[in-house]
């Protein structure tokens, strides 16, 4: 039996966040020693992009997305879509659009969140890039959006990040072609629905993430 470690991909992290300013190099040493071969940094708002790009220069394992998080909808402006598009076209290390989505757990501004979600989904479809989806207490609303886009043949594929839904919801997203990514919440003792999802998701659609520094 081989002694080599399996390759691990962290499908969602925020390594540029200030939480890592004191020990980022040591964190990199740890992920390398644990067999992490690639990391995907999820952008949450446009002002992050230069720092993420610089971080990708420093750490060759890093790839990244560009996008606006639903809880950062207030950062959206007239030029935002152009900024995201240009950033995606200018760097081949941009491999996704996001972190986009809906969050009705921490906010109730559904119409504002939808107003920045749709342009990003359209951009992803135009550029043929997958999306990184943040969906918290909003599975019904998110499924409605994706189902309508799918009916019109313009629904991008992607990953449901930090999955926290139930099996029924998961199957609906799987039917739309999405991957399911599990984070530290799958270890929570009372996260029964997430445990069941982790058991039932097809291996070919199963991703893992740290969502660092959060989980």
Language-model-derived ranges and their functions:
Residues 1-215:
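Mid-domain alpha/beta scaffold segments of enzyme catalytic cores
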């Amino acid at each position: 039996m081989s002694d080599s470690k399996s390759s691990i991909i962290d499908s969602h992290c925020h390594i540029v966040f200030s939480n890592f300013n004191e020990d980022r190099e040591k964190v990199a040493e740890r992920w390398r020693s644990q067999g992490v071969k690639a990391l995907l940094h999820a952008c949450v708002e446009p002002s992050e992009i230069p720092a993420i790009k610089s971080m990708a220069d420093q750490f060759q394992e890093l790839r990244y997305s560009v996008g606006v998080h639903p809880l950062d909808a207030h950062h959206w402006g007239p030029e935002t879509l152009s900024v995201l598009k240009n950033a995606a076209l200018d760097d081949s290390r941009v491999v996704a659009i996001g972190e986009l989505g809906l969050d009705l757990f921490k906010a109730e501004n559904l119409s504002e969140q939808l107003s920045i979600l749709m342009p990003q989904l359209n951009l992803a479809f135009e550029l043929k890039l997958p999306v990184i989806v943040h969906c918290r207490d909003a599975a019904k609303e998110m499924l409605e959006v994706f189902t309508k886009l799918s009916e019109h043949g313009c629904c991008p594929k992607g990953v449901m990040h930090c999955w926290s839904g139930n099996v029924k919801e998961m199957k609906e997203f799987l039917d739309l072609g999405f991957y399911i990514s599990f984070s530290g919440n799958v270890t929570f003792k009372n996260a029964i629905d997430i445990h069941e999802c982790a058991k039932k998701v097809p291996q070919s659609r199963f991703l893992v993430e740290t969502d660092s520094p959060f989980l």
